């Protein structure tokens, strides 16, 4: 099982944690966000958002902005604008399952992962053994 996670071995959880594919509800699995590079590299081959000849409004949740921007800038003919996640005026979100609290509340009662908080359609995913590590999600 360890080899099948390559290069994300640090996401390994043993069988005592239950079903590996649903552990995103209990842990921040890709806490280093290394799957973001793989996710962004899939955009030209797995979507048609580059061929629409329009600027894409994109936001990030749990994904480091500098890493995400650097990888997005490598895509040919990909015109994008980074939008504020909390304002909600984006078309797509690049995300991991990092915990996300409400901006205005300093409590733990409303903390959810990015996967749970941001609704939409997963366009591209990076998965290992059924566990989603990161996704490009289209806003509903």
Predicted regions and their residues:
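Short beta-strand-to-coil "C-cap" segments at the C-terminal boundary of structured domains/repeats
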Residues: 136-140
């Amino acid at each position: 099982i360890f080899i099948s996670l390559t290069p994300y071995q640090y996401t390994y959880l043993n069988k005592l944690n239950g079903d590996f594919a649903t552990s995103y509800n209990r842990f921040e699995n890709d806490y280093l966000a290394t799957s973001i590079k793989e996710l962004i590299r899939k955009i030209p081959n797995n979507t048609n958002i580059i061929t629409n000849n329009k600027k894409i409004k994109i936001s990030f949740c749990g994904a480091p902005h500098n890493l995400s921007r650097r990888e997005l800038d490598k895509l040919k003919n990909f015109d994008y604008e980074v939008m504020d996640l909390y304002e909600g005026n984006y078309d797509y979100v690049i995300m991991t399952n990092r915990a996300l609290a409400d901006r205005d509340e300093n409590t733990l009662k409303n903390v959810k992962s990015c996967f749970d908080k941001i609704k939409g359609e997963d366009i591209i995913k990076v998965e290992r053994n059924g566990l989603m590590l990161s996704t490009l999600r289209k806003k509903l």
